[in-house]
Amino acid sequence: MSIQTDDYRTKYTLETFSFLPEFTADEIYDQIVYIINQGWTPALEHEAPEAASSHYWGMWKLPMFGTRDPNAVLAEIDQCRAAYPNHMIRLIGYDNYTQCQGHNFCRFTVLGECNSHGTNNE
C-alpha cells in the first residue's frame, strides 16, 4: 500500500485571492480586463519571497498609464518574470480618483514557510 504525501509547506497569503486556487490564464486575463474597464491604471510590483512581507515591493517600470490593451499588460508581466524569475509578482490597479489601489493580486507566488521575521526557512 502506498501512502501519498503532499507538499505541506505554507503558501504565502498576501491578498484575498491567495486563499483561492491559482488563477488560470483566462482568469488572469479577466482580472486585467476588469482593472482596465474600471478606468484604473495597471502596474506591476515584484519582490524576493524572503522579503515579501517585511517591506514595500519594488515597482516594475512605471505604471501603465492609459493602457487599454490587456495583452500589453500580459507582455509586461512576462518581461518582469523574465527579468526576475525567482520573485513574486503582483498586479495592481491604481484608482487615480480615490488615489489608492482599487485592486491587486499576486500573479506569481511561491511555497515556503516563513518565520516571524518574514524570511524563508528553505
Curated annotation (Swiss-Prot):
InterPro entries found in the cross-reference section: RuBisCO_ssu (IPR024681), RuBisCO_ssu_dom (IPR000894), RuBisCO_ssu_sf (IPR036385)
Keyword Transmembrane: no
MF-aspect GO terms: ribulose-bisphosphate carboxylase activity
One cellular-component annotation, GO: carboxysome
Induction entry: Both mRNA and protein accumulate at 0.15% and 0.03% CO(2), but not at 15% or 2% CO(2) (at protein level).
Localization per record: Carboxysome
Keywords: Bacterial microcompartment, Calvin cycle, Carbon dioxide fixation, Carboxysome
GO BP annotations, alphabetical order: reductive pentose-phosphate cycle
Pfam families the record matches: RuBisCO_small
Signal peptide from the UniProt entry: none
UniProt xrefs under CDD domains: RuBisCO_small
Family: Belongs to the RuBisCO small chain family.
The protein's assembly and partners: Heterohexadecamer of 8 large and 8 small subunits.
PANTHER family referenced in this protein's UniProt entry, alphabetically: RIBULOSE BISPHOSPHATE CARBOXYLASE SMALL CHAIN 1, CHLOROPLASTIC
Alphabetical list of HAMAP family matching this protein: RuBisCO_S_bact
Note: The basic functional RuBisCO is composed of a large chain homodimer in a 'head-to-tail' conformation. In form I RuBisCO this homodimer is arranged in a barrel-like tetramer with the small subunits forming a tetrameric 'cap' on each end of the 'barrel'.
Function: RuBisCO catalyzes two reactions: the carboxylation of D-ribulose 1,5-bisphosphate, the primary event in carbon dioxide fixation, as well as the oxidative fragmentation of the pentose substrate. Both reactions occur simultaneously and in competition at the same active site. Although the small subunit is not catalytic it is essential for maximal activity.
Designated name of the protein: Ribulose bisphosphate carboxylase small subunit 2
Organism of this sequence: Hydrogenovibrio marinus
